[in-house]
Amino acid sequence: MPYANQPTVRITELTDENVKFIIENTDLAVANSIRRVFIAEVPIIAIDWVQIDANSSVLHDEFIAHRLGLIPLISDDIVDKLQYSRDCTCEEFCPECSVEFTLDVRCNEDQTRHVTSRDLISNSPRVIPVTSRNRDNDPNDYVEQDDILIVKLRKGQELRLRAYAKKGFGKEHAKWNPTAGVAFEYDPDNALRHTVYPKPEEWPKSEYSELDEDESQAPYDPNGKPERFYYNVESCGSLRPETIVLSALSGLKKKLSDLQTQLSHEIQSDVLTIN
């Protein structure tokens, strides 16, 4: 029997950084599955391999490698075309499965030199740190508060390295998580009493509340079930928020389709065995 509900989606807000939308006519298990897929199953590109050629800074090589991996990289235009490195036929790295970055900075002045994401030079103009979006390529012209700090160098210190970014997803490592935050709520007026407030009148109301100003929470509904879910998905900058949502829904749909196919094969095998 096909799933009886017919879910609907309504977008309430869309910006460059986040999307808010409402899903109706579904249940809590499906809603939470969608949330988890946003975080763990949507692929993006992140630095995964680092070779440090010179490092006289105060940070160990491992510290710097970890910081590089967590710098968000713009992945919109290439993530679907890039292969997973485990599926590529190359021996190490190639343009089909990776993007190369280089960094070469030496401090020759008395003033502290901030090495930032702006100093990472990509061999692909489509994959750059999110802070370098729509910026020129002059490494000396940077705005400190806009870029992600990697390390600080004093006079005579240097950092020189080569790194490769690969395709992956959040279930493998947090650096491949495309979201900065994912949240959903399903009972803005607390009619189901899944949350107990010590003083409901002092608790801030949800932006989706339909109560009057003098009401603190809706009457208790003991038979109620959550059917409407209010989502807020914030991107880390690697993908546009709408791309995250569409990719997640596509991935979840494929998982369910694969499960249905496998179950059909299992049922057919059981029928043949019984006969």
From Swiss-Prot:
One of its GO terms (biological process) is transcription by RNA polymerase II. One of its GO terms (cellular component) is nucleoplasm. The modification Phosphoserine is found at residues 124, 257. It comes from the Eukaryota. GO terms for molecular function: DNA binding; DNA-directed RNA polymerase activity; protein dimerization activity. InterPro entries: DNA-dir_RNA_pol_30-40kDasu_CS, DNA-dir_RNA_pol_insert, DNA-dir_RNA_pol_RpoA/D/Rpb3, RBP11-like, RNAP_Rpo3/Rpb3/RPAC1, RNApol_insert_sf, Rpo3/RPB3_RNA_Pol_subunit. Residues 203-226 are annotated as: Disordered. Pfam families: RNA_pol_A_bac (PF01000), RNA_pol_L (PF01193). It is found in: Nucleus. SUPFAM superfamilies: Insert subdomain of RNA polymerase alpha subunit, RBP11-like subunits of RNA polymerase. Zn(2+) binds at residues 88, 90, 94, 97. Keywords: DNA-directed RNA polymerase, Nucleus, Phosphoprotein, Transcription. NCBIfam families: PRK00783.1. PANTHER family: DNA-DIRECTED RNA POLYMERASE, DNA-DIRECTED RNA POLYMERASE II SUBUNIT RPB3. Component of the RNA polymerase II (Pol II) core complex consisting of 12 subunits: a ten-subunit catalytic core composed of POLR2A/RPB1, POLR2B/RPB2, POLR2C/RPB3, POLR2I/RPB9, POLR2J/RPB11, POLR2E/RPABC1, POLR2F/RPABC2, POLR2H/RPABC3, POLR2K/RPABC4 and POLR2L/RPABC5 and a mobile stalk composed of two subunits POLR2D/RPB4 and POLR2G/RPB7, protruding from the core and functioning primarily in transcription initiation. Part of Pol II(G) complex, in which Pol II core associates with an additional subunit POLR2M; unlike conventional Pol II, Pol II(G) functions as a transcriptional repressor. Core component of RNA polymerase II (Pol II), a DNA-dependent RNA polymerase which synthesizes mRNA precursors and many functional non-coding RNAs using the four ribonucleoside triphosphates as substrates. HAMAP family: RNApol_arch_Rpo3. This is DNA-directed RNA polymerase II subunit RPB3. It comes from Homo sapiens.
